[in-house]
Amino acid sequence: MLGKALAIFVFLMLNVLVAILLERKILGWMQLRPGPNRVGPWGVLQSLADGIKLALKETITPGGVDKFVYFAAPVISTIPAFTAFAFIPFGPVVSVFGHRTPLQLTDLPVAVLFILGLSAIGVYGIVLGGWASGSTYPLLGGVRSTAQVISYEVAMGLSFAAVFLYAGSMSTSQIVAAQDRVWFVFLLLPSFVIYLISMVGETNRAPFDLPEAEGELVAGFHTEYSSLKFAMFMLAEYVNMMTVSSLATALFFGGWHAPWPLNMWAGANTGWWPVLWFTAKMWTFLFIYFWLRASLPRLRYDQFMGLGWKLLIPASLVWVLIAAVIRTLQNQGYAHWTPILVISSIVFAAALVLSLRKPFTTPHIRALRRQLRRKAKQLPTAPDSTPVFPTPPLPAKALAAASKEKARG
């Protein structure tokens, strides 16, 4: 047990170092710049150098802070992030020094709900850190983070309900075992879309990084933190990203099962190969995080709340109802439940994706667009020889005309 815990800790720390480096490299590539390239060959040691730099920095404690809560907040954020990984299955039963053991630290009948609860506990560190800093900007960042977790934790939990219905269990290992033939992403596509959006909001990442919006809150909840305390907040953020990515892999992408066509090989799901498939799937979701950060602007607070409460939560409730009805047909022996579920899943997911545009346009802007279209239709058509919009004179011509008028006067 202790060896597994140590292996998970080392796995997470190494992946955090690689994730920070790759994020900066990928952002540089997408923004047409080289990215970090100074420390080590091609900049591969940049993350390690940054970690050492943060460890050696001076610890500055602002005056007037609640010191106990101020120092405890990073720890409260970090511990649940690491603990949640104890319930993630990396692979099947393997032989380690002659001892047969599953590649999972532990499991529970309600493991997914336990992970959901741990992810919610992590927000306490953010809220307490913002409150204990004794500053306005961190406090606002903490309050935003609380509202964000409350809004998107509901949608995320509802996206799990359909998975529980078809897996027949809340255990992560049992859910992975239920996907040995068909991954749930093909049967429950709307649940995956809702979870994908919710996991980005849950981890406070772009375009949902409102608790640490630089243009509004300086650095958000960790404005007053430095040195190792800031590093712990950063570590918790990246470990949480890996936790929700691993959970998406376990719930929707077959966990450690090999993807097609590799699953045609007889030994693809035996030995240590499943660890490779699991890690590759997890890194696919991490790449989506980096891609979203490079592509999308930050949402306004009202847009973000509207997306969660007006779209994701109602859509989750409707989809759970549809999935439950189809599951009832399956239990009653209806033979064609699979094509009905797949077609319903595709249609509902397409409607959900098309509906994502509505929360990002406010009602008065939509009304203004309709009004402008009506007025444009009422305008008389101009002849082809005359431009619709008059071309203003160049600055040089305007100055010359003004000087002539002055000379005449």
UniProtKB/Swiss-Prot annotation:
Enzyme Commission (EC) number: 7.1.1.-
GO molecular function, one term: quinone binding
Biological process terms in GO annotation: aerobic respiration
EC category name: translocase
Origin superkingdom: Bacteria
Protein's membrane topology: Multi-pass membrane protein
Known catalytic reactions: a quinone + NADH + 5 H(+)(in) = a quinol + NAD(+) + 4 H(+)(out)
TM region positions: 2-22, 68-88, 108-128, 149-169, 182-202, 247-267, 272-292, 306-326, 334-354
Recorded GO CC terms: plasma membrane
One Pfam family in the UniProt entry: NADHdh
Subcellular location: Cell membrane
InterPro entries registered for this protein in UniProt: NADH_UbQ_OxRdtase_su1/FPO, NADH_UbQ_OxRdtase_su1_CS
Keywords, in A-Z order: Cell membrane, Membrane, NAD, Quinone, Translocase, Transmembrane, Transmembrane helix
Family membership noted in the UniProt record: Belongs to the complex I subunit 1 family.
Known function: NDH-1 shuttles electrons from NADH, via FMN and iron-sulfur (Fe-S) centers, to quinones in the respiratory chain. The immediate electron acceptor for the enzyme in this species is believed to be menaquinone. Couples the redox reaction to proton translocation (for every two electrons transferred, four hydrogen ions are translocated across the cytoplasmic membrane), and thus conserves the redox energy in a proton gradient.
Subunit structure: NDH-1 is composed of 14 different subunits. Subunits NuoA, H, J, K, L, M, N constitute the membrane sector of the complex.
Entry protein name: NADH-quinone oxidoreductase subunit H
